[in-house]
């Protein structure tokens, strides 16, 4: 028995090192035009719209968005295999076989489309320009610093700024992928996933995963529909259930029965979920109650509840200080690693007459075969550098002329300077993302808020100028790193760079129309969107607005002792990150993430409780059956997220049609209930 077990392990180890490309060696790789098919684009549009709704919902609730790459790849595989089988059974002749290259095109297009729902700033810089967020920030109302959302200008703005990043990194694709051999962990993981789908064993597992995803999609959608019946007023429904008591509920400690964030908790690392809950306990459990006892001393007692000169100011600005401290540390860390790695790469290339394709010794012949095969096809379909550079210049000129027409507060020279600096930042972000899998696009955007906001003037619309510059920078930098990730995925699945680029361009174009349309649906259907305590509070919009105010007006408007607390938390964020990097791995995995801790400082810990319940489910599942949990936890989580997210569409339609939920389920204390009963008893009977 021992021998047979050892032989089985040896066979498994031998199978593990078998070349991926030798498995697919007998299959013809289609040309790039045959990879970008009409059926692939149709499926991409469907999935892109679905994921845009999901990302938009997450964006407008907490801003925590997990990776949906697994779901996109899995659903793309399922829909296209089902499509080809149906046509085959219908007797349609010459049905083109579904290949992993086509699967990669779908994956790229879907992620590019849904990515605009995040980088488009609908939960951050664009919505931060509105009067609704301006009124919450406590600033004096100034029409120069307000621009309300409108479908026309949002679509136009996104089309102008979202393509420059793609053209900025095209000339560097060979350097990034082949010469420097950057890992791009997410792109590599996606490629492994797609390659596995197209093996017999992987296809069988994928069918089971899709079945599991579909089951939990239906459950989550049905649960959202059921909950809707009980939300017939403010503070009604399961999302206002005081599961831990009324006092805890007043301090945002409750489970709101959100299938979305239970699913998010199952996907996110344990440390992220624990950090969110810890931040909620520290802020809403300790700090805010203590500061509220200082009402009348630290801040006036007669302020509106939403005033930034009161308790809300502490919540917002301390949260911002944590975010900025964490962002600054990671920015310097990634830039240091990027610079060091670049210097080492250049020295190595100068000292060697040729750069070995295999990447050095110690690799097996099978790995060398994979590298040679992939490099050969990656270099086959070139994208002319002159075309990319010319397109960048043309789009930049058009953008410099048109963006100031959309945002008259932003001058043409602000945009021009952004486009001169952007390619360097796009390269740094793409390179750093390849090393660490960490995109700093939002950090570069925040830098633009402060620099352009300070450059402009408050009386001249500096707040809008800073926010618009943030959008320009994020639009360029985020799409650049996304494209290089896709080049890595295409490299490992033998998809042509041209098909990757074309699908990214098409997906981005889809996103520039779909994402604003989805946001507009939310904006028109839910009239309290962006308001504290609503279903869609959009916390990042207020954070970005106040960053712009700080950039323009300075620190004079902060409440008493708020600046001292902000400095303390800013330094603490840097110190915790430094401790995480210096500590041993066994210790570092218990140190919290400041960025995750910052999110509940303003919103409250309720969604952190949801996420920790998701973590607990995943932890127990891992303990009981680790192999099954690894295979099926992501589809289950994706089903929970997608079902609840897609329910938002019919919910929006019902709201637009004026159909209101028939029941209000609300919870009262015993003493309040006695008063309500007494009041009702005095009413005349009908």
From Swiss-Prot:
Cell compartment(s), UniProt: Membrane
Residues annotated as transmembrane: 36-56, 60-80, 109-129, 151-171, 212-232, 271-291, 316-336, 383-403, 415-435, 461-481, 501-521, 556-576, 597-617, 639-659
Broad class of where this protein is predominantly found: membrane
Protein keywords: Membrane, Transmembrane, Transmembrane helix, Transport
GO molecular function: oligopeptide transmembrane transporter activity
InterPro entries xref list: OPT, YSL-like
Pfam families: OPT (PF03169)
Keyword Nucleotide-binding: no
Topology versus the membrane: Multi-pass membrane protein
Annotated Gene Ontology cellular component terms: membrane
Signal peptide: none
NCBIfam families (UniProt xref): OPT_sfam (TIGR00728)
Similarity remark: Belongs to the YSL (TC 2.A.67.2) family.
PANTHER family, sorted: METAL-NICOTIANAMINE TRANSPORTER YSL10-RELATED, OLIGOPEPTIDE TRANSPORTER YGL114W-RELATED
Role this protein plays: May be involved in the transport of nicotianamine-chelated metals.
Listed name of the protein: Probable metal-nicotianamine transporter YSL10
């Amino acid at each position: 028995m021992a021998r047979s077990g050892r032989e089985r392990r040896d066979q498994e180890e031998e199978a593990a090192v078998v070349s991926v490309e030798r498995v697919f060696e007998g299959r013809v790789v289609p040309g790039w035009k045959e990879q970008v098919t009409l059926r692939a684009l149709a499926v991409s549009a469907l999935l892109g719209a679905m994921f845009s709704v999901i990302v938009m919902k997450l964006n407008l609730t907490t801003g925590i968005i997990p990776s949906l790459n697994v779901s996109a790849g899995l659903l793309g595989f399922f829909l296209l295999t089902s499509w080809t089988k149906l046509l085959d059974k219908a007797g349609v002749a010459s049905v083109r076989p579904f290949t992993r290259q086509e699967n990669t095109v779908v994956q790229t297009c879907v992620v590019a489309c849904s990515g605009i729902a995040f980088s488009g700033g609908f939960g951050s810089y664009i919505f931060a320009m509105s009067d609704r967020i301006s009124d919450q920030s406590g600033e004096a109302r100034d029409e120069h610093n307000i621009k309300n959302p409108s479908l026309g200008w949002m679509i136009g703005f996104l089309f102008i700024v979202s393509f420059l990043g793609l053209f900025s990194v095209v000339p560097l694709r060979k350097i990034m992928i082949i010469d420097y051999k950057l890992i791009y962990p997410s792109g590599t993981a996606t490629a492994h996933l797609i390659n596995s789908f197209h093996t017999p064993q992987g296809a069988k597992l994928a069918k089971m995963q899709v079945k599991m995803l579909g089951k939990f999609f239906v459950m989550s959608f049905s649960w959202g529909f059921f909950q809707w019946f009980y939300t017939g007023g403010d503070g009604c429904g399961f999302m206002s259930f005081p599961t831990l008591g009324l006092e805890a509920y007043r301090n945002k400690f409750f489970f709101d029965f959100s299938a979305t964030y239970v699913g998010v908790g199952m996907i996110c690392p344990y440390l992220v979920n624990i950090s969110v809950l810890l931040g909620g306990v520290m802020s809403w459990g300790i700090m805010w109650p203590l500061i509220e006892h200082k009402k009348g001393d630290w801040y006036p007692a007669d302020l509106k509840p939403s005033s930034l000169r009161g308790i809300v100011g502490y919540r917002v600005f301390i949260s911002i200080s944590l975010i900025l401290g964490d962002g600054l540390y990671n920015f310097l860390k990634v830039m240091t690693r990027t610079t060091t790695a670049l210097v080492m790469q250049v020295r190595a290339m100068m000292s060697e007459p040729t750069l070995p394709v295999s990447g050095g010794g110690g690799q097996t012949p099978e790995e060398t075969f994979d590298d040679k095969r992939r490099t050969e096809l990656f270099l086959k379909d070139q994208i002319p550098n002159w075309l990319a550079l010319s397109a960048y210049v043309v789009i930049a000129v058009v953008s410099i002329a048109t963006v100031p027409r959309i945002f008259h507060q932003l001058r043409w020279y602000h945009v021009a300077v952004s486009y001169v600096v952007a390619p360097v930042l796009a390269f740094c972000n793409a390179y750093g993302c390849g090393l660490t899998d960490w995109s700093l696009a939002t950090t570069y955007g925040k830098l633009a808020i402060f620099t352009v906001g300070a450059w402009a003037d408050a009386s001249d619309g500096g707040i809008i100028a800073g926010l618009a510059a943030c959008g320009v920078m994020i639009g360029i930098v985020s799409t650049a790193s996304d494209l290089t990730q896709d080049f890595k995925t295409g490299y490992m699945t033998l998809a042509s760079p041209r098909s990757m680029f074309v699908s990214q361009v098409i997906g981005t174009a889809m996103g520039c129309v779909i994402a604003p349309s989805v946001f507009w649906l939310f904006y028109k259907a839910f009239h309290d969107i962006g308001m504290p305590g609503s279903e869609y509070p959009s916390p990042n919009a207020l954070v970005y607005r106040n960053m712009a105010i700080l950039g323009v007006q300075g620190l004079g408007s902060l409440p008493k002792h708020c600046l001292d607390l902000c400095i303390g938390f800013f330094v603490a964020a840097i110190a915790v990150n430094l401790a995480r990097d210096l500590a041993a791995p066994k210790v570092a995995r218990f140190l919290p993430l400041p960025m995750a801790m910052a999110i509940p400082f303003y919103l409250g810990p309720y969604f952190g409780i949801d996420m920790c319940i998701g973590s607990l489910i995943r932890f127990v599942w891992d303990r009981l059956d680790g192999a099954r949990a690894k295979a099926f936890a992501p589809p289950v989580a994706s089903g929970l997220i997608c079902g609840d997210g897609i329910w938002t569409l019919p919910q929006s339609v019902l709201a637009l049609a004026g159909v209101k939920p028939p029941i209000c389920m609300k919870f009262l204390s015993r003493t309040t209930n006695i008063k309500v009963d007494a009041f009702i008893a005095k009413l005349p009977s009908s």
